């Protein structure tokens, strides 16, 4: 059977763990009128209760659902049957019949661990015996538990014997069909836990010593600082299961102690175990659809953090233009950006959604590739309907639904129309080189989720200053960057006083053309006007960061810094190179290209007190992933039919591996040529750059260059050695991945969606796709 690899999680440690008080006797517990309590057995003179959480849409007479029963922890000595109530409620809401079961413990009945195991098996047997009445599939019953309860659960699926001879349905199997184990006690050897309590029954009662190919699929959660269950024990258990051909998942949470999965210890870990339990059961085919983060949010004792989010996106800033990313060949000083990077996490393999402006901005706000719309190549020019349809959810609409105030200060570049304020007539670009003062905007940012907008449409219209839905003045373009700095700082100061979380999107005007550094920045770099403009841009970033810090909200604010694509040819790239500055660092190409220089971008995140400083991530991420990442951060569900190309990389913020949510990442050049990145392989459906760097496509065809390019990005980051002819199988696989992702309307996990157009051309360099 297929198995998963071990994932290790780095999360903030707490050094105490929750215990649950022992009671003097076993009594019926009240969970509410929606929970049914029944006695599943009587032992040691006490009635043992099992509590059923029923799916709302479940008809037991005709519907057979999978079931799960949870056993509390407490060292076989005590514990509360309420420990896993929220997990039971969650899984019932997701469609399973969920139970929490009481069982005998030393403090109440004076019984040893063997009695706990007997009761666990009796509970599973009781559920299977009554499966028809309860509407349960008798072949899909999971046992779950934490600590000693994890031992009980594991024993029901792995250990033979230990059945209560007084069970009324002794002929019915007590074996669980899946195991959900939270820091379980599953090694009872002399070097394990509890050997002194189970000496006579060892090794038969020790799950780790009884693994066979018949064992059920298992998921285990463990903290790396667990003093009772060593990580080595968990790894050995996982390896033994996999070697036996049993499907196994192990998640180790770095720095976490025993009991870490309880919300009172680590809300983040608690949430994560909900999600991964759901995904595990989904893998087994017991659940359908994605985890319900909104329900998890409702079940939490305390609301999850709602940090302010400041997203700063430069325009045409190259990867190598940030000095800390290009220490050898970066000649432009960027102290503020470097400081931001040092204070948080650097993503070294981050990409824009496209190698050019408009598509990247569309992808950021919608979580969807722009080529799924009417715009198949190039950029928009304004004076036309907004590229984001009114019904499509955006990051801004989603955040606003969660109580955020939202603002954009800067460049929109996603089209909107202008109306004459007197007549309501739509204005045409041919008659208005610059939108007139007073022109109204019916479909701008304030109609796509933003409460406030101050900025401009794109560089050619930069003189027209817009606030909310109106052109308010004309101003010289040299003043735009200082204006955006002033407006952003003012917004942060005002929003910080409201005590309401805010999302501020700052798509800067620089260092895109027109390259217009302010007078005090002219000549500062000693390199070129472009370099001066980059230095001024760095200063603006510093002003925004200072505003956050001076308002005392750095602990509650996630700052993201990036660029929309690589550096433009307008920077005079060759002249800068002659002076020792490489705008793309070690990468080939620049803005508009399929090569890395076109779309590999600086990407930093700072969240003081949450993201560790001086850290980095080599996960392959994309600006388009921000929608899913923000939704994940806020424990909220991505709206239906939204963010089809967005995959959360939230675990990376904590130093954790990011689970695969897609086969690969799709790249696109200014001319619409496609590329596909999967692991360290990158396929380009172009003979040349696909953009502005030589050889362009027509010249590459004349030179009879191969129709495809395949690079090993890890071994050849400069994309100098085309391996397509040597690895045709890999090129073909990546091509099929790309083809599938295009036609199914999404590149991430989930149901197929619809593209806005049926005319997406996979191959842009001829009438038919050449054979691989």
Task: State each model region's role.
Residues 81-100, 332-341:
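Short amphipathic alpha-helix adjacent to the substrate-entry channel of hydrolases
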Residues 116, 227, 235, 244, ...:
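Formylglycine-dependent sulfatase
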Residues 242-259, 455:
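Catalytic histidine neighborhood in serine/cysteine hydrolases
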